[in-house]
Amino acid sequence: MEYRAITAENFYLIEMKNTCKFILENKVEEDLKKLLKINNILETVSESNFSKKFNTINKRLKSLTDNLKKQIVDTDLASARFINLYSILCNERFILEFLEEVVKEKYNNYDYSIKESDFLSYLATKSEQSEIINNWTAEGKRKMLVKIKNFLTEGGFLEKNKDSYKIIKPIVDLAVIDEIKENGNEKIL
């Protein structure tokens, strides 16, 4: 998995749920892009906005088993957010490694606070380790840190405090965890 600057992507939980619901109800396997556009499932206002959302959603959908697609539609909000974050982590190495190297490390050491300096330190380390990240613009790097914060907050792993983020362990439906263990990328758990 390559490092990518996904500065224009968002969490897109509603769009993922709507797309999965549409796929399940209509047993769609071909022409997904065309059908989503015709039915305005992604609720976009322009062709470029549709293309941007579709490309992101389609990439993430490929990470989900049919069972996870069903679960993101039918499960509770916290579990749906987790499934959506899982689909992001399956595709975005920079965010996955932050979760593994910073969040998990701190959590395992009973340190439940992530400060701005932790984000900056992670970015500096990754810039040293990867020419790709080192070549991102300063603005691109800043936006990627914002994406990490937003995605992990929306995914249920972080909670914003006054001057830091609190690490929380999301409560996820056991059926979702079991599905990922059996048929998905267990490393992400």
Explain the meaning of each model-derived region.
Residues 1-82:
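Eukaryotic partner-binding/assembly regions in large regulatory complexes
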Residues 2, 6, 19-22, 26, ...:
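Leucine-rich, amphipathic alpha-helical/linker segments
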Residues 60-63, 101, 105, 125-129, ...:
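Amphipathic alpha-helical interaction surfaces
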Residues 69-73, 108-116, 133-136:
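Short acidic alpha-helical/loop segments enriched in Asp/Glu that coordinate divalent cations
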Residues 83-86, 90-113:
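Positively charged, polyanion-binding regions of nucleic-acid-associated proteins
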Residues 115-129:
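DNA-recognition alpha helix
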Residues 134-189:
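Accessory, usually C-terminal, subdomains that scaffold auxiliary metal cofactors
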